[in-house]
Amino acid sequence: MTITINNYNNDKKNLILGLTGSVATIKAKLLVEQLIQHFNLIVIPTETSLKFLSDQDFEFISSKCKIYKDKDEWENVDLLKRSALHIDLRNWANSILISPCSANTLGKISNGLCDNLLTSLIRAWDYKNKSMILAPAMNTMMWENPFTFKHIETLKSISPNVFIIDPIEKKLFCGDIGMGAMEQVPKIVDFTINNLK
């Protein structure tokens, strides 16, 4: 399968933005607005992340970059060409940014689970030659949970090309005040620019 994107520019590197089931996905439009200034961009939302995107934001994002969803993995299987979307996406990308990275997705990828397009891509990722950047976003108690620490340590041990953008402390969507909010979008974009392989 040929990977197609909107407004392709040979002078830019190729970045995949993964969106997961965290309320911080409401910042996806702002993230895309800033990332497309620096990268050829493809967005892969998990099914739960779509619940946090308004119709207007989804329409805006799809007008600026290509979106691949879980169903695209199965609709584009080509047995004759031996093509798989998650492999084609890996080959296309220079780097992947998962922002926000929910507790659920963090747990999945740190344990090698691959039950959707995004986690299948991560399971097939080339950690030796390509960077993977995660910006976790979750409730404070989820962030401070011992499992989260183990998941982060596991991912960091895989490769020096795995980067974690720690969350920040603020009043969270649920009303709690504490660590767990996704880092500010401009800082995520700057970090991605500076750590792209």
Swiss-Prot record:
Enzyme superclass (EC):
lyase
The cofactor remark states: Binds 1 FMN per subunit.
Organism field: Dictyostelium discoideum
Coiled-coil positions: none
Q: Does the keyword Lyase apply?
A: yes
Similarity section: Belongs to the HFCD (homooligomeric flavin containing Cys decarboxylase) superfamily.
The catalytic site is made up of: 174
Annotated residues that bind FMN are located at 52, 102-105
Protein name according to UniProt: Putative phosphopantothenoylcysteine decarboxylase
Q: Which cofactor does it need?
A: FMN
Q: Which GO terms describe its cellular component?
A: phosphopantothenoylcysteine decarboxylase complex
Kindly indicate whether the keyword Lyase belongs to this entry.
yes
Q: Which UniProt keywords apply?
A: Coenzyme A biosynthesis, Decarboxylase, Flavoprotein, FMN, Lyase
The record describes its quaternary structure and partners as:
Homotrimer.
GO BP terms, alphabetized: coenzyme A biosynthetic process
Query: Disulphide bridges in this chain?
Result: none
Listed GO molecular functions?
A: FMN binding; phosphopantothenoylcysteine decarboxylase activity
